[in-house]
Amino acid sequence: MELASKYNPADVEGKWYQYWLEHRLFSSKPDGREPYTIVIPPPNVTGVLHMGHMLNNTIQDILVRRARMEGKNACWVPGTDHASIATEAKVVNKLAAQGIKKTDLTRDEFLKHAWDWTEEHGGIILKQLRKLGASCDWDRTAFTMDEERSKSVLKVFVDLYNKGLIYRGVRMVNWDPKALTALSDEEVIYKEEHGKLFYLRYKVEGDPEGRYAVVATTRPETIMGDTAMCINPNDPKNAWLKGKKVIVPLVNRVIPVIEDDYVDIEFGTGCLKVTPAHDVNDYMLGEKYNLPSIDIFNDNGTLSEAAGLYIGMDRFDVRKQIEKDLDAAGLLEKTEAYTNKVGYSERTNVVIEPKLSMQWFLKMQHFADMALPPVMNDELKFYPAKYKNTYRHWMENIKDWCISRQLWWGHRIPAYFLPEGGYVVAATPEEALAKAKEKTGNAALTMDDLRQDEDCLDTWFSSWLWPISLFDGINHPGNEEISYYYPTSDLVTGPDIIFFWVARMIMVGYEYEGKMPFKNVYFTGIVRDKLGRKMSKSLGNSPDPLELIDKYGADGVRMGMMLAAPAGNDILFDDALCEQGRNFCSKIWNAFRLIKGWTVDDNIQASDAAKLAVHWFESKQNEVAAEVADLFSKYRLSEALMAVYKLFWDEFSSWYLEMIKPAYGQGIDRTTYSATLCFLDNLLHLLHPFMPFITEELWQQMYERNAEEGESLMVSALSMDTYVDTAFVAQFEVVKGVISNIRSIRLQKNIAQKEPLDLQVLGENPVAEFNAVIQKMCNLSSITVVESKAEGASSFMVGTTEYAVPLGNMIDVEAEIARMEAELKHKEGFLQGVLKKLSNEKFINNAPAAVLEMERKKQADAESIISSLKESIAALKKA
């Protein structure tokens, strides 16, 4: 088939993706091969592809495709997450646009709307991943709320409850007033804010002098919930308050002064207002001293009846109003500018409210004890390893996980309340009824007598089971698939969910499988724009990935992403990198067309230059292939791509093909041509994981392939020789230096390539065996070893050997002298500038060492060039 003159991704990508699907080349079933398994970090079911997904899934696809070519049984499992908070918020907004409130609907009615929304918008992102070339086993596509996953979640909840690890109780939680649900500690993001510190006057009850204590607080709106004041017993300045009672400003509630060394003597005035219902630390003091708790907030962040004042007003409006009212009452001593960290909901970006609430919790210490050692001793490896410390810190400071959410979209908690109080926990209503009858001794109970908990589970409670539940390891422990595919091989994810997801998967993996869920974790960086800003919709600096693919092709975008993605570091993404990727596609395409355009002539033998070229490139390719394998083993994928890129662009295209290219209108010998096709095949294998579409197209074009059998580069073995003639490769670097210098002389002296030159080697020729290559590449008449160079010759050094090119009458001597004198003048001026800088004592004393070293190198380079120019000018003037 005739190959188009230009590479057009649109002609290639859809065609080959469909071919791979039709021949089920992404499919995996347990067999005798070594498994290679990756589970996709499930994106939100209603999400759309963004640059972070592009990076993450490009990396996963590279790893999976490489494993396939290594002969492993590669299984990449896709799926989506039900994303309770995000999805419910979208459904609520959609209903609101139709004039419907969530509170107007029954749970079942709301869930019908949620399922409709999910079916309409769900899975879009997985379809978009196909455009990227993602080679997932789509038959295995899972959803965290599908039947199999739901059964797994409920079974685990019941099991952990029966083990005494899940409990229900009133605790201080992070409350999201917008989503109207509790959050885990990991779902709270702390942001630095510039606010005020309010100094409030608490009058001492019955004090004849009318004295008062002053309390510093950032939250004056919570004084309605104050039930004590606390001082440090070792604080002399507040000792006069011991045993006293004070009056809460505006509220006029009398509260005791208690003593505890928890109070920081240096903060504010050393007096602390204690609000047990709305501060985590105050809650602990309340528990310790048996203080009452007054919850002054409604779930939506407005003040409740219990507050007594400002009822129904928003908490932040109250803060503004209470400042005025306190000041008017003479109860505000002063305010100061103050910077502190405020907790925000990760999902809704509103300030969270610490709140006492009845919730379900999972005890975490048991899990942390199992999950910390394997990471710290590198049984389970993190790339980059710096994230081990982040992981350790969290594990060593673990807190119980609040797993209940006041939402309807999600896995409903399988707890059923009994008519006379108490509850039972069971995976199904039928089991719950049987347990209820047994617990109450009332055989007449029916399902109508039981009331299931309204709350649902934290989304992460389903996704922590992902590597196990995808292979049905919870419902059917020890089945063929879980035994074969688990533990999975690699996890590719962002460090922002190391606690939410990575750590918890490790925990539950040891709990239910007795081993880690994956062998390696590769943490990607954050995708930023070229100015270093995080990509976001609000900044408008995040390109549409699908538009990038349409413009540059999937291979171009994949390559652009990976060129910008050093392992574990943030990615400074620039469209120019995708353009570089597209240009590389064109380079590959044109090199292929060049080779396939040659005519094989069986009547000619390989030239000496071609034999040397083949021997060199075979070693060079094997050397780079070994380097790439080593880089893959260290997850340095960007460097691996760059190594293959340079091998193809520089070594293969710029050097090898130039060395073997037949003269215009002539044929090429069969031996060299066969070797070249073999090299090209190897290069396509090395490039395929990074650039699957163009490599498949060209591989299919190389020879007649069996399309009916689904023959494909994707499942073609990556097998390369390991032999490297190291000395030969090193010598060839010298040869390249010689050729490059001769080419520079032609360029500088404006001598056409068709004009043959002579080369003189002074002393001894260290690369004499490569003379045929040098002669061909530089169009040389001869290479001779001499004791001294010809008058007027242009010379250069490669290593310790001097080479000279006699120019004779090839140049206009006067013009060349004028050119070199102009260059000499420029270089001398440049050198003076450098010397002036280096003679400046202030610069020498203050400049970083690297800058000084750079300036000294500039000096040395300029002096060397000046010396060479003077010598050349003198030689020309003599001639």
Curated annotation (Swiss-Prot):
Residues 807-878 form a coiled coil. A motif ('KMSKS' region) lies at residues 534-538. Monomer. Signal peptide: none annotated. This is Valine--tRNA ligase. One of its GO terms (biological process) is valyl-tRNA aminoacylation. It catalyses: tRNA(Val) + L-valine + ATP = L-valyl-tRNA(Val) + AMP + diphosphate. ATP binds at K537. One of its GO terms (molecular function) is ATP binding. Its EC number is 6.1.1.9. InterPro entries: aa-tRNA-synth_I_CS, aa-tRNA-synth_Ia, Anticodon_Ia_Val, M/V/L/I-tRNA-synth_anticd-bd, Rossmann-like_a/b/a_fold, tRNA-bd_arm, tRNAsynth_Ia_anticodon-bd, Val-tRNA_synth_C_sf. SUPFAM superfamilies: Anticodon-binding domain of a subclass of class I aminoacyl-tRNA synthetases, Nucleotidylyl transferase, tRNA-binding arm, ValRS/IleRS/LeuRS editing domain. ValRS has two distinct active sites: one for aminoacylation and one for editing. The misactivated threonine is translocated from the active site to the editing site. It comes from Bacteroides thetaiotaomicron (strain ATCC 29148 / DSM 2079 / JCM 5827 / CCUG 10774 / NCTC 10582 / VPI-5482 / E50). Belongs to the class-I aminoacyl-tRNA synthetase family. ValS type 1 subfamily. A motif ('HIGH' region) lies at residues 43-53.
